[in-house]
Amino acid sequence: MSEPRARRFFQQIISGIEYSHRLKIVHRDLKPENVLLDDDLNVKIADFGLSNEISDGDFLTTSCGSPNYAAPEVIRGGIYAGPEIDVWSSGVILYVMLCGRLPFEDDDVQILFSKISRECQLLLFAVCLADAFTGRGQLPHSIVPLT
């Protein structure tokens, strides 16, 4: 997919996620199959079956979602605020749109997540989770505009 088209779709995905996070809802299963396009090629996020309501200061612990798109802390069964896992999944979707393949693949979930370096996890954590554990539960504004 071309970068301009991927940028347009990604902007709309992030906008939809930010909107749901403002409503205190985290999707938890973002993947291309749950990103639909209408007749005008506008993104519609679908399948909120694994979504959860989030509260400031509370954490989620359920391991859910599609392993190839789920954040490492979800697969490990760790705690998470919520919005950061949608950001991770969005990043994987962007990678797939631009490269045509997943960044990490394996049939075994443990091997899959061992392929994601600790440094990569920490970088994504630092960039995407700046406010997640302070109770704000919103995407950092620095990643929204992609112009």
What kind of region is each of these model predictions?
Residues M1-T147:
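Eukaryotic serine/threonine protein kinase catalytic domain
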